[in-house]
Curated annotation (Swiss-Prot):
The chain crosses the membrane at residues 230-250, 303-323, 326-346, 366-386, 398-418, 453-473, 486-506, 522-542, 554-574. The gene is TMN3. InterPro entries: EMP70, MFS_trans_sf. A motif (Endoplasmic reticulum export signal) lies at residues 581-586. It comes from the Eukaryota. Pfam families: EMP70 (PF02990). The lineage of its organism: Eukaryota, Viridiplantae, Streptophyta, Embryophyta, Tracheophyta. This is Transmembrane 9 superfamily member 3. Its main location: membrane. It is a multi-pass membrane protein. It comes from Arabidopsis thaliana. Coiled coil: none annotated. Residues 1-19 form the signal peptide. A motif (Golgi retention signal) lies at residues 590-592.
Length: 592
């Protein structure tokens, strides 16, 4: 237990040290009257397309003198954050009333640029003393008109800041756009714009330590919690009923099988065996494509370990709201540090299956998940570059990730592979395998791989689909998700149901005298990932307002990688459960 605990503390310390948080220049967040408080403009973009964001000054706002880019951590860059010094001066407890910071004549091209942005519901994001600020840049006045050509477009030119403070610390900031101070963008003509801002300070009793609670509470409101707990209870009841029903049948059938086989042993020796005992000489025959199978188990085990560590960090409060860069940092760091687990698992299991080319197996393990992810990233990063979006990673960040993969991930993968190869573990089979495989009898269509995968994936998916909406709304929207304890319960339910349904289907497969259960159990366990991807289609077209080539490609591209990861992880869980079950039942009977 000491190694996982030490690793968790190391990762947490690394993330807390600044790898993913938006840190101000004032490290202690204490200010005197008139002190400059850091204010950074982050990004702008269509409200319904969270991946399609641009630099704040890509819109033709007034660019002040001495604009500086903030040095960002890895997680911030991966999150698409591009912070620059903002044009507003919000010094501590310094009130301002309609102060003009810029007068500008907008050209026809700039008016058209702003109008397109307003039409797409562009919003902006800033950070003031690490606190997030949002607002829309303009509004569309439709006035009950159905013809879009008659709509009027306006740009907000007056932003009103209300800042709450407690003694020498900033506690909260709100930004409101003045609905009466507008610039008409409807016509393609030059327009004079006078941008201004107002600052009001108010004292509050809220402590500095609780200033982020406001953002976490939005997902913990009573009616939201009721929905989450209702979904949990509904999932638990459904799962208990279905798994209980299957367990009862399976236990009864197994009991009858054991009694039948015990009686057969006392009967005549020439009596023909039937059912799963009949194939005892083939059930532990190693699967085809041993190297790919072992690599899949190695990658799935690594992703399972990664998920557990992410849950541990979330439950101790590392991923608080608007510290989303920390999640990306944690994913990169933990994936790199756990690559040795993939190497060890794949190599040791491959050697147990009497594989000879362990180097090839190790290369396959290293590229099985990273390969598709890298190809997807290359395509999507090219799209982001074409759009000049902040999602396009800078060359320096790509070099950092390549160095992490080269100097950390790959060496640990090789070390784990060498350790697995030298473990000298033998595959534990309770019965001997015959020299020649038995022929599998003809089976009905519903016992083939695809129908079995459909049945195996539906039950686990039904246990998590309600919670999926909130996760999607957080990852691909602006909803805040902080109820990690509920999400962890859902994850445990998912694992239990996946393991159980895979065991049940494996038994029915063996009972039909089909001994090729290795790959089938893995595919059945991982099929929930396919259901999640099908849900992506439903969510995109029915529950979201995302649009455009970039957002569509980002959504389906990265969700394909995530669902593929779930496929490998849950496939590993399903196979491990099935292997324990098969070993148990064949250890419980006497086979010649």
């Amino acid at each position: 237990m000491r190694l996982p605990t030490t690793l968790l503390l190391f990762i947490g310390a690394l993330i807390f040290s600044g790898a993913g948080t938006v840190r101000s220049d004032a490290s202690d967040h204490r200010y005197k009257d008139g002190d400059s408080v850091p204010l950074y403009a982050n990004k702008v973009g269509p409200f319904h397309n969270p991946s399609e964001t641009y630099r704040y000054f890509d819109l033709p706002f007034c660019i002040p003198e001495g604009v500086k880019d903030k040095k960002e951590a890895l997680g911030e860059v991966l999150n698409g954050d591009r912070l620059v010094s903002a044009p507003y001066k919000l010094n501590f407890r310094d009130e301002k009333d309609s102060e003009v910071y810029c007068k500008k004549k907008l050209s026809r091209e700039e008016v058209e640029h702003f109008r397109r942005a307003v039409e797409k519901d562009y919003y902006f994001q800033m950070y003031y003393d690490d606190l997030p600020i949002w607002g829309f840049i303009g509004k569309v006045d439709k006035e009950s008109k159905s013809d879009p050509s008659e709509f009027k477009y306006f740009l907000y030119k007056h932003i009103q800041f209300e800042i709450l403070y407690n003694k020498d610390r900033v506690i909260e900031i709100n930004a409101r756009m003045d609905p009466h101070s507008l610039v008409d963008l409807t016509e393609d003509k030059e327009v004079d714009a006078e941008f201004m801002y107002t600052v009001k300070w108010k004292e509050t009793e809220t402590s500095f330590e609780k200033r982020m609670d406001k953002y976490a509470m939005s997902s913990s409101l009573p009616h939201h919690l009721e929905i989450h707990w209702f979904s949990i209870i509904n999932s638990c009841v459904t799962v208990l009923l279905l798994t209980g029903f299957l367990a009862t049948i399976l236990m009864r059938v197994l009991k009858n099988d054991f009694m039948k086989y015990a009686q057969d042993e006392e009967a005549a020796d020439d009596q023909e065996e039937t059912g799963w005992k009949y194939i005892h000489g083939d059930v532990f025959r190693f699967p085809k494509n041993k190297s790919l199978f072992a690599a899949s188990l190695g990658s799935g085990t690594q992703l399972f370990t990664l998920t557990i560590f992410i849950f541990m960090l979330s439950l101790v409060g590392v991923f608080y709201p608007y510290n989303r860069g920390a999640l990306f940092t944690a994913l990169v760091v933990i994936y790199a540090l756990t690559s040795g687990i993939a190497g060890y698992t794949a190599s040791s299991f491959y050697c147990q299956l009497e594989g000879k080319n362990w180097v090839r197996n190790l290369l396959l393990t290293g590229g099985l998940f990273c390969g598709p992810l890298f190809l997807t990233f290359c395509f999507l990063n090219t799209v982001a570059i074409a759009y000049s979006a902040t999602a396009a990673l800078p060359f320096g960040t790509i070099i950092v990730i390549v160095l992490i993969w080269t100097l950390v991930t790959s060496p640990l993968l090789v070390l784990g592979g060498i350790a697995g190869k030298n473990s000298k573990a033998e595959f534990q089979a309770p019965v001997r395998t015959t020299k020649y495989p038995r022929e599998i009898p003809p089976l009905p269509w519903y016992r083939s791989a695809v129908p079995q995968m459909a049945m195996a994936g539906f039950l686990p998916f039904s246990a998590i689909y309600i919670e999926l909406y909130y996760i999607f709304a957080s990852v691909w929207g602006h909803r805040i998700y902080t109820i990690y304890s509920i999400l962890f319960i859902v994850f445990i339910i998912l694992l239990i149901v996946t393991a159980f349904i895979t065991v049940a289907l494996t038994y029915f497969q063996l009972a039909a005298e089909d001994h090729e259960w290795w790959w089938r159990s893995f595919l059945c366990g991982g099929s929930t990932g396919l259901f999640i991807y099908a849900y992506c289609l439903y969510y995109y077209y029915a529950r979201s307002d995302m649009s455009g080539f970039m957002q569509t490609s980002f959504f389906f591209g990265y969700m394909a990688c995530i669902c593929y990861g779930f496929f490998l992880m849950l496939g590993t869980v399903g196979f491990r459960a099935a292997l324990l079950f098969v070993r148990h039942i064949y250890r419980s009977i006497k086979c010649e």
